[in-house]
């Protein structure tokens, strides 16, 4: 920089350059949205590479806890592994996910405006947000089944979880919310849609990254693989 300052007749040499990150691998989804496998950050050298995620909201507070860990490990594998290794890991996560109870795979949310969306002739009004709809259904069937002594009704401002349900089911609905535990008395555990939960909590966030590098989330049959 001293030589450059002389060449441009600078009054004083005040140019400096700081090293931000040195990485051996990176994936960009858009401007200022990327994942880096960083070995050196602002002059600090690491013995093991660290993941730097910028502008990619894949892991949110609304992500079920098991998927947060799974996504972090998946991103690390993206930086060091192959497409086949990532696909194998996704299948492993899918199998493990189905063994978690609804209380762990439900989407955490807060709930408000219960009275606003409560229906007069129906349980809820048209256009009710899914987490609120699940809460109104919970309150209705807890009361209908005389379970109010065991489970508190969901109130405005409470933190809840909600799960998608497979249809058909006896409730004829595709969602249920709950505060801590999904009441076994409602007989809905067997109707929890684990495939849809996994799709929205894990696959959709990771597909944003994989699509940028042309990788798949599962193996697809091709003519080449058919004849091999």
Residue ranges and their predicted role:
Residues 2-228:
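DNA-dependent DNA polymerase catalytic subunits
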